[in-house]
A protein has these predicted regions:
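Short, charged, low-complexity amphipathic alpha-helix
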Residues: 1-2
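N-terminal core-binding DNA-recognition domain of tyrosine recombinases/integrases
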Residues: 12-27, 37-127
Length: 127
């Protein structure tokens, strides 16, 4: 079950879009939420917005859209590298997270028009 109260509004809007317009399954929505929450927690640490390093204690509700607008492809690569180095994530796991990030940024830039630049546009799928 997704607790929408823990998410920033733009993430909840994306999840609503995937349910209503893309007709994704509840499982897919849950995975998108998990993947993107993990990514946003990483961004919060990476951008030095928190001193907390325990991801289970990091909140994402307060990450403003202005921070999302600052994310570059290098930051996404840093996240995928973090998954490899910290969690020894396999390529399939990283590929799913990359896909979630790609769909999220496509929504923000092309559908919701909340950001001008899509940093995931040239993101390749990990192999």
């Amino acid at each position: 079950m997704i607790n929408h109260e823990n998410n920033p509004d733009y993430l909840n809007s994306f999840l609503d879009y995937t349910v209503t317009i893309l007709n994704k399954s509840p499982n897919t929505i849950k995975e998108y939420n998990y993947d993107l929450a993990t990514f946003l927690k990483f961004i919060k640490v990476h951008f030095k917005m928190t001193d907390e390093e325990d991801f289970s204690k990091i909140t994402i509700k307060d990450i403003p859209l202005s921070t999302i607008k600052q994310i570059k492809l290098d930051d996404i690569h840093a996240f995928l590298s973090y998954l490899t180095n910290t969690y020894h994530s396999k390529a399939a796991t990283r590929a799913r997270k990359a896909s979630s990030i790609r769909v999220f940024f496509n929504y923000l830039s092309q559908k919701a028009n909340l950001i001008e630049f899509n940093p995931a546009q040239n993101l390749e799928t990990p192999k």
